[in-house]
């Protein structure tokens, strides 16, 4: 028998996951099934991918962002090169760029507390933020 859509999603997720934080196929399958149960729209996914590929350069739009911005990127992301995150930071005035060695294109459970700390700090900075500076 051929691969099911869930089997294929597990395979793709594992391919782009974090080399330093491997996840079992069973765990990834559980996550994929939860998404599937939330009625993930596959046509919407493909529209999003097409829009991202055909979108114009965003540099000028990024320069308009004045809020404190947190960019988290995996140093081992095989889907979106880390240089894309570095480039984004250059164009967002109040951006903080944080990378994680060994992280791919996912959010490893082992790093969730660090993510939450960074996000909480960014929110706190935003509460007292003066966009005129």
Question: Whereabouts are the PLM-identified features?
Answer:
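Alpha/beta-hydrolase
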Residues: 1-60, 67
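Non-transmembrane alpha-helical segments in soluble domains
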Residues: 9-13, 89, 120
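Short, conserved loop/helix-junction motifs that constitute active-site signature segments
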Residues: 63-66, 91-92
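Short beta-strand/loop motif that positions the catalytic acidic residue
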Residues: 65, 71-73, 77
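Conserved alpha/beta-hydrolase "acid-adjacent" motif
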Residues: 78-84
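Catalytic active-site module of serine/aspartate enzymes centered on a nucleophile-bearing elbow/loop
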Residues: 94-133
